[in-house]
Every structure is written in structure tokens, then in C-alpha cells.
């Protein structure tokens, strides 16, 4: 669908003023200027940045300035650059565990409307004027995800029905009736597809959680629809990047965010195509500009060009969290959910356990519960990680609440 359209790139051309001069190099130079302006603004108005002004504005050679989720949890108000009276919405993000402090993210009305500005071209890949979109994400209030999507879609004469998260499948099915596009989190959309296979949305947008390809394939098969994916988080102001009809990476919100990929240990930028930690600077935000924010997510810029003909770097599918990812000596990375994608797509794999040893060659040892062919398993893993030595054994796997790849020395 619309594989040649470049809605987000065109929006960036207009927002940045670069027009026909838009290239990856010119965009990065423009972004770096905006980040510098945001650093000066933040150092003047926010206590956190003011207390670290020298490190922010004049770092020592080889030093890098970053902020983390823990910085925000500790004193979120210290990141404010405006009066609390100008804050239109505060989002509280709980921390796993009973004692962890939550993150609180502050937005002005201007910040939130900028998100709607990005949603407008982003949703154009999967919708047409005159259609109906049902949103299975939070809320009716104007500055919720649903409310901002409503604002964005109304600009293109598209109707929006905001249902909220799926709690009752019958009610959700009723809300989805007649919709051309459904927006929701992957697991809930998969459940809805199984419960209501006769729904026939033309498109589905998945967001809010990691998107397994098995879910994409299931929705495409049951509903015979085209599935799009979105990347973003509360810290980015919800919007971050969205797939176009070519489905090869996220077209980024480059007019408001500068995305970088760094080595998680050294903090140095890594070459395009290399996996590392996703870092962003929300340079356009006025209320709480997060600058050089380490997300803890593993990603990379796509090494190839997009089928739509776009000229800007795209973010590849985010692989998960750093703490659940192992970086290989050859520059690749592997995580438990990546293995899930490969192994659970194979017939005869009921469960598995994995161990990885790097000494220095990487050896992946698998215990497979089921009757899958070991040679087939090795072949499929080598398609994704050609540098791994694979050892496959059959056996009973210990059930654990949280699975991970065991690192062996």
C-alpha cells in the first residue's frame, strides 16, 4: 500500500525548511544546531542541566553527556524548563517492582500538539480521507494517545473512534465493526483477531510494545490486512517512528528528535548498520526537553535504502532491552526474543533453553524440547547469525517465569 509515498520525509522537508536540500548529512547538521540551542535553553531554565552546565556544553575530550531513566526518577521536576502552570499533562510511568520510583514526564500543550503534527503524516501511510479508524489505546481525553490521534486524523477528514485498551473482546469487536484501520498493542490485536476473524480492517497499526513477527503474520493471515508498526515511548512524546508501505524500518520524527546509536559501554557512536543503544534528544520540547537520553533499547539504523525511495536514515526494529541482549564480537547482537522469533516459528519446537559462550568464537548451545530437526534449527539460526557455532541437543527444559540466554565463561 502506497509504497512510493514519502509522507514523513515530506513533512520533515517542510518543518526543517530544508526542502529539496534534504539529505541525511544536511538533516544531521540541522539537528545538531537545534540540539545545541536546546542545550543552552535547558542550561538556563532547568536545574538538572544548570547543575551540569559545563559537562553539557563543554564536555572534556572523550567524555559524553547522557541522561538516564534513573535521573528522571530521582527528581523529575529538575528537568522542567517552564512554570508548572504551563504543563498540560504529566505521565507517570511505573517502575517494575514495589519499591522503585516511577518516572514522571511533563508536557506543555505545544509539546503534545507537536506529537499530533507527526501523527498526521505518519497515519497517512495506512489511511485515506473518508475512512474510519478505531483506536484500542488509552483514552478519550484530548492529550491522550487516542485524543492526539483524533486531532491528527481529523486534519485529513478521517473519523476516529477511541475505544481504549481491550478488556472485553465482545465490546472490542463491536467497536471495530466497520473500521478501515485498527490501532492497538500487539497482544491485544492478536487476541481480537482470534476472537473476531470476520473483521476485515484494511490496515492495522501496532504500537506500545515489542511486535513479534508471529503476531504480524497472524493478523495478515486472519484479517487479510496490511500491518504497520510504530516505535515510540512516553519519553519521546509518544511518537517516534513509523513504517511506510515498504515495511523496512521506521521513518523517524526527525524534525523533533535526533536519534543516535551508541556503544552501550563506551558511549561512542557506532557505524550505520551496527547494533547499539538507542539515544535520543527531544530538542523541540519546551516543557521537559530530554537531551542525550539513554533509552536502554537496542537498535540500529537500517543499512539499506527504503523501498519508498526515502533518503533519510531509518531505525530498524528495536530488539529489546540492553540487559536482555548479548553483543557478539563480530558486531551482531542476540537476545532471547530474537531466538523466540526464529525457533517458535519452526514446527516441532515446544520450548528451548539457550547458552552462549564467547571464547572468542561465539558458540550457541540449545536444548530443544520437541521433535524439530536439529539440522533445520541450525540452518534457520545461521540465516540470522551466520557467525555462530550451533550445538543442538534434545531434552526437557526447566520452566522459568522469565527466560534468558545463559552466558557461559
Where are these regions (language model features)?
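Nucleotide 5′-phosphate-binding alpha/beta core
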Residues: 1-94, 101-114, 121, 125, ...
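Conserved AMP-binding/adenylate-forming
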Residues: 217-305
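Active-site phosphate/ATP/adenylate-binding loop shared across adenylate-forming ligases
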Residues: 2-7, 16-17, 70-199, 203-222, ...
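General small-molecule cofactor/ligand-binding pocket signal
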Residues: 143, 161-164, 228, 389-394
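AMP-binding/adenylate-forming catalytic core of the ANL superfamily
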Residues: 284-386
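Conserved hydrophobic helix-helix packing surfaces used for dimerization/oligomerization
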Residues: 133-134, 278, 366
Amino acid at each position: 500500500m502506497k509504497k512510493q509515498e514519502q509522507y514523513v520525509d515530506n513533512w520533515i522537508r517542510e518543518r526543517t525548511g530544508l526542502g529539496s536540500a534534504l539529505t541525511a548529512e544536511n538533516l544531521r547538521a540541522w539537528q545538531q544546531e537545534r540540539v545545541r540551542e536546546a542545550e543552552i535553553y535547558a542550561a538556563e531554565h532547568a536545574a538538572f542541566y544548570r547543575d551540569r552546565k559545563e559537562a553539557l556544553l563543554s564536555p572534556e575530550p572523550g567524555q559524553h553527556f547522557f541522561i538516564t531513566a534513573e535521573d528522571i526518577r530521582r527528581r523529575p521536576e529538575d528537568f522542567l524548563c517552564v512554570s508548572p502552570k504551563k504543563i498540560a499533562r504529566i505521565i507517570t510511568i511505573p517502575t517494575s517492582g514495589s519499591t522503585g520510583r516511577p518516572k514522571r514526564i511533563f508536557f506543555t500543550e505545544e509539546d503534545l500538539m507537536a506529537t499530533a503534527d507527526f501523527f498526521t503524516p505518519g497515519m497517512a501511510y495506512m489511511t485515506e480521507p473518508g475512512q474510519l479508524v478505531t483506536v484500542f489505546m488509552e483514552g478519550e481525553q484530548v492529550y491522550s494517545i487516542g485524543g492526539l490521534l483524533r486531532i491528527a486524523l481529523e486534519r485529513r477528514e478521517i473519523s476516529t473512534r477511541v475505544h481504549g485498551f481491550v478488556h472485553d473482546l465482545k465490546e472490542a469487536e463491536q467497536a471495530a465493526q466497520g473500521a478501515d484501520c485498527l490501532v492497538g498493542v500487539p497482544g491485544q490485536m492478536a487476541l481480537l483477531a482470534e476472537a473476531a476473524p470476520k473483521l476485515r480492517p484494511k490496515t492495522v497499526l501496532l504500537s506500545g510494545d515489542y511486535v513479534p513477527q508471529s503476531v504480524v503474520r497472524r493478523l495478515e493471515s486472519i484479517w487479510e490486512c496490511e500491518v504497520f508498526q510504530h516505535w515510540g515511548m512516553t519519553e519521546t512524546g509518544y511518537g517516534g517512528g513509523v513504517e511506510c508501505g515498504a515495511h523496512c524500518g521506521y521513518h523517524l520524527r526527525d524534525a523533533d528528535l535526533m536519534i543516535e546509536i551508541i556503544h552501550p559501554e563506551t558511549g561512542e557512536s557506532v557505524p550505520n548498520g551496527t547494533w547499539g543503544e538507542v539515544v535520543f534528544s527531544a530538542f523541540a520540547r519546551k516543557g521537559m526537553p530530554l537531551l542525550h537520553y539513554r533509552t536502554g533499547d537496542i537498535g540500529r539504523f537500517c543499512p539499506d535504502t527504503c523501498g519508498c525511495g526515502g533518503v533519510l536514515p531509518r531505525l530498524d526494529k528495536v530488539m529489546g532491552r540492553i540487559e536482555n541482549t548479548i553483543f557478539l564480537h563480530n558486531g551482531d547482537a542476540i537476545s532471547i526474543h530474537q531466538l523466540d522469533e526464529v525457533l517458535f516459528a519452526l514446527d516441532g519446537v515446544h520450548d528451548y533453553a539457550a547458552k552462549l559462550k564467547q571464547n572468542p568464537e561465539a558458540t550457541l548451545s540449545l536444548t530443544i524440547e520437541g521433535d524439530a530437526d536439529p539440522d533445520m534449527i541450525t540452518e534457520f539460526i545461521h540465516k540470522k547469525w551466520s557467525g555462530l557455532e550451533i550445538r543442538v541437543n534434545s531434552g526437557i527444559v526447566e520452566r522459568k517465569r522469565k527466560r534468558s540466554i545463559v552466558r557461559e565463561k
